[in-house]
Amino acid sequence: MRLPVVLLFMALAACNPQADEQADKAVTEADRETVPALEDITGRWRVVSIDGETLSAAESEPYLAFSADAAGGSVGCNRFGGMALYAGGRIAAHSWGGDAMACIDPQGEWETAIAELFRAYPQVRLSGDNLRLRSREHVVELMRADGLGPLDRSPDPMRIPVPDLVSQDLANTEWTIRALDGETESSSPIDRHLRFYEETWQGLASCATLFGTYRREGNRLIVEGDIASTEQNCSPEYAALDTAFAELMRDDPHHLVGPNGELIIAGDEHVLTGDRAR
């Protein structure tokens, strides 16, 4: 009984060799993709396509650029960007802004897609001179434009220059939590905070205050031991924010302090953004 079925599949494969070739090509490309180091993506990249739509060559070439603490670019209308932390094959953006010129489509649609992409903590994969940024909703394909090396200015057009290096030490600092996984709603919208002491931290993202210990290794927070919590009494959607907050801190996340009082903490699946408390 099985022989006719086998023969049927063989016949279908023989009738559609192009589909097989495309599938093999997709598998091969996926096998070649790697998680790049920061130095592998630093620099300027030409935007090849956005969500499968190829961008035609123009006088003002669409591009994205990356530095150690920012990302930005243009698709022919506004310049846009923001403070960004790259770690573990993903990019976390603190905020995304730029020029305020009204753009006709398709540039307007492209700008919206790129903004949504960076707000969604996209994955980054490298294959030769090609870079792919992917979120659940959007995919941007890039091609290396200028080789490796530092840029002559920040990719973030909104960056306010500061004369000194920004300290990454978190001890004895207090932050207002701005968003967790892009979610700004909370059962405690006024009291959301994250405080670091010499060896301990505490934070309120939504319902319960979490407590734990930590140490720094470079730009990583190593959270050891249990994470304690006050009593949680809120609806499931708000309680989920507390769960995400705890998972983030257990990930031994990377962190970045920006020049204008910004904070990004990024783990495997979750991202917290905040601003220095005033």
Cite the ranges covered by each PLM segment:
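Lipid interaction determinants
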Residues: 15-278
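Sec-dependent bacterial lipoprotein signal peptides
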Residues: 1-13
